[in-house]
Regions:
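Residue "hotspots" at secondary-structure boundaries inside conserved domains
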Residues: 88, 138-141, 199
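Terminal (often C-terminal
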Residues: 95-161, 182-184, 217, 222-236
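Small/polar residue-rich beta-strand/coil "junction" motifs that cap repeat-based extracellular fibers
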Residues: 77-79, 89-99
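Generic structural signal for coil-to-beta-strand starts
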Residues: 15, 72-73, 95, 147, ...
């Protein structure tokens, strides 16, 4: 530097000082980097068509924050490779998506005959979506402790008169009666129960949908996405 006002010096206190144009702009110790000035800024990249990232190198697991240049998104994810396991993505319009956030929607594509001797698990054979793959064998399993919202619609037909139709959320050791309908005095009952609830769950707790009745004679749970479905997602 011709006028000797730009320098990198090692002080006697084991600190490296960086000065540009006569102004201290940064200090570096064995565990800390401090940027000085009125508007300190760190720029990663040079406007080229390339990905840029910061990797946090943990003992058991790495994480990254970076720019996915091909998609023009800022991503936060697991691992050192950008975009391999994205937990959160921010696009150029400020829209945020969470590709691994627990969220599912399943429905019946065929009817299910039910007898009146036992409470019956409602089965689901079609997944519209299942982020994080937490739903299987008609049961949702919570991957983490939190508050979960569940909603369901159950269509039923040929329930005999003089009794009740009851739909339950069965959550591990808890049973939540979410819908009850009197069968009335008709020879048969056609109906739909639509229900929703927010439930506190621990990791590995499960939730499934059940139906029961005290009417005489068998009945059926109807199919089709708009009649019998089950959905849920992590709230907080």
């Amino acid at each position: 530097d011709a006028d000797a006002d730009t320098s990198i010096t090692a002080d006697t206190d084991d600190q490296v000082d960086i000065r540009v144009g006569g102004t201290d702009v940064a200090t570096l110790t064995n565990s800390n980097l401090v940027l000085k000035g009125t508007t300190p800024t760190v720029t990663i990249g040079d406007a080229g068509a390339e990905d840029a990232k910061i990797v946090f190198d943990g003992n058991a697991q790495d994480y990254h924050i970076g720019l996915d240049d091909s998609a023009d998104t800022l991503v936060i994810g697991k691992g050192s490779a950008l975009g391999t396991t994205t937990s959160m993505s921010f696009d150029a319009n400020g829209i945020i998506t969470k590709p691994l956030q627990p969220c599912f929607f399943v429905y019946k594509s065929s009817s299910q005959d039910v007898d009146t001797t036992n409470t019956t698990d409602i089965t689901f054979d079609t997944e519209r979506f299942d982020l994080n793959s937490d739903f299987g064998s008609n049961v949702f399993t919570a991957p983490v402790t939190g508050k979960y919202h569940f909603s369901a619609s159950v269509g039923y037909v040929n329930a005999q008169a003089g009794g009740n139709i009851m739909v339950y959320f069965q959550v591990s050791n808890a049973e939540i009666l979410a819908h009850r309908k009197d069968a009335g005095s008709d020879d048969s009952v056609y109906g739909t129960g639509q229900i929703s609830v927010v439930i506190d769950m621990d990791a590995s707790d499960t939730c499934k949908l059940q139906i029961d009745t005290n009417t005489d004679g068998d009945y059926a749970v109807e199919s089709a996405v708009y009649r019998t479905y089950f959905s849920g997602y992590l709230v907080a």
